[in-house]
Amino acid sequence: MRIFEKAPAKLNLGLDIKGRCDDGYHELAMIMVSIDLNDYVTISELKEDCIVIDSDSSKMPLNNDNDVFKAADIIKNQYGINKGVHIRLEKSIPVCAGLGGGSTDAAATIRALNRLWNLQMDYDEMVAIGFKIGSDVPYCLGGGCSLVLGKGEIVKPLPTLRPCWIVLVKPDFGISTKSIFRDIDCKSISRVDIDLLKSAILSSDYQLMVKSMGNSLEDITITKNPVISTIKERMLNSGADVALMTGSGPTVFSMCSTEKKADRVFNSMKGFCKEVYKVRLLR
């Protein structure tokens, strides 16, 4: 029996660092959306008690450092599963890009194993497992437009956004999320008004939404990688309604109210970076 799951990428329309918790992690407030740039996870059972991962990508580890392996290992141990599993990852989401590729693959693995082994986990049980792996995994279990709070474990669905076009630009380097979070100074970091952004979404006010979007991590990443600022400027000069880094970077995305605008931004960036994508929001 094979189980097939689609694993969509995510974007941060808003990412605010509210402070540092006593355990060293940060309290977050984020608004996230899913886009139609997808990885695909195919899972089948093995007789041997092991976890085997293979992929069409050579840009990530296929051992216990992979979030997919961690998801399978936690579930096997938690539910006393003595069977093995083969996990095939077909990658389209760039690695170490701020698009949640590892997190969405882990979430897809949790959903798939729940079906394969008939574990009958409810959403909260899957979230608890996902949160052990990473702060974006709980969101990726359900996706869509959502408010994400705490350390990532609190996910509250929001209304679907109006249709629009997204252009993604991924520079030719990756970013370590841990290294960016290590450099956060909660006293001086730029803040994002997530409540205002949420209000704009609830009232379907597109203009207010794009004005309210922001990312507290952007300045830190730009200090290390100034090309991100150049990408934003080029996108805005090409007619993007907004240009913003997602996650800890380095991917920059623009939102465009029409496909014509998106095509103009896309064409302006193709000669500047190798990895440029035109996608839609998932509804």
Curated annotation (Swiss-Prot):
Keywords: ATP-binding, Kinase, Nucleotide-binding, Transferase. GO terms for molecular function: 4-(cytidine 5'-diphospho)-2-C-methyl-D-erythritol kinase activity; ATP binding. Catalyzes the phosphorylation of the position 2 hydroxy group of 4-diphosphocytidyl-2C-methyl-D-erythritol. Belongs to the GHMP kinase family. IspE subfamily. This is Putative 4-diphosphocytidyl-2-C-methyl-D-erythritol kinase. It comes from Streptococcus agalactiae serotype III (strain NEM316). It comes from the Bacteria. Its EC number is 2.7.1.148. Pfam families: GHMP_kinases_C, GHMP_kinases_N. The keyword Transmembrane does not apply. ATP binds at residues 94-104. GO terms for biological process: terpenoid biosynthetic process. NCBIfam families: ispE (TIGR00154). The active site is at residues 10, 136. It catalyses: 4-CDP-2-C-methyl-D-erythritol + ATP = 4-CDP-2-C-methyl-D-erythritol 2-phosphate + ADP + H(+). InterPro entries: GHMP_kinase_C_dom, GHMP_kinase_C_sf, GHMP_kinase_N_dom, IspE, Ribosomal_Su5_D2-typ_SF, Ribsml_uS5_D2-typ_fold_subgr. PANTHER family: 4-DIPHOSPHOCYTIDYL-2-C-METHYL-D-ERYTHRITOL KINASE, CHLOROPLASTIC.
